[in-house]
Amino acid sequence: MDLKKLDTATQPSASPRALISYSHDSKGHSKQVLDLANQLRADGIDCRIDQYISNPSEGWPLWMDKQVEESDFVLIVFTERYTERSQQGRKSGVRFESVLMLQELYEAGMINDKFIPIVFEQKNSQHIHKWLKPYSYYVLESTAGYESLRRRLMDDPAVEMPALGPPPTKKGPIQP
């Protein structure tokens, strides 16, 4: 049985695919990430996290590379620890993921629709990587923050632009 075909066959084609990149700061933080992933899946977003996989046969680095490449979006949960682990010279999964993401962003000419910074608390916004600071980030302290993120992932703006009306008719020159 081809598990890849089975996996994609069960997913609606309109569902965006998202990966969550995060550091295992604590059990509580990992639970927040799991809850977020579960909620996104419940809302029709094909969300992937490492917690859903016990042992990828290709190994963690190749699994992560594949997830980053195949995802429509990568949600990056910034904390102080995430940023520390991503620093040059560190040997960690977060460092590896950061390099993959930065390289993809570089190759796209820094045009970014894919890599989305998120924080569970506003205070962690100071830890967003400088190469992601020019882009919108989402604070998930409230339902409104989550809803904004969900709408972005589903390409469902909160305010729809109205249709453009006809141009004004020319009235001719002004008569003296």
Located regions from the model:
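C-terminal interaction surface of TIR/SEFIR-family domains
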Residues: 1-18, 22-42, 87, 111-176
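A generic local structural motif
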Residues: 5-6, 60-63, 103-104
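Conserved BB-loop
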Residues: 35-65, 80-90, 94
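Amphipathic alpha-helical transducer elements in NTP-driven molecular machines
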Residues: 61, 95-99, 143-147
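An anion/phosphate-binding loop that grips the pyrophosphate of nucleotide cofactors and donors
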Residues: 71
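Arginine/glycine-rich "motif VI" loop of SF2 helicases in the C-terminal RecA-like domain
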Residues: 96-113
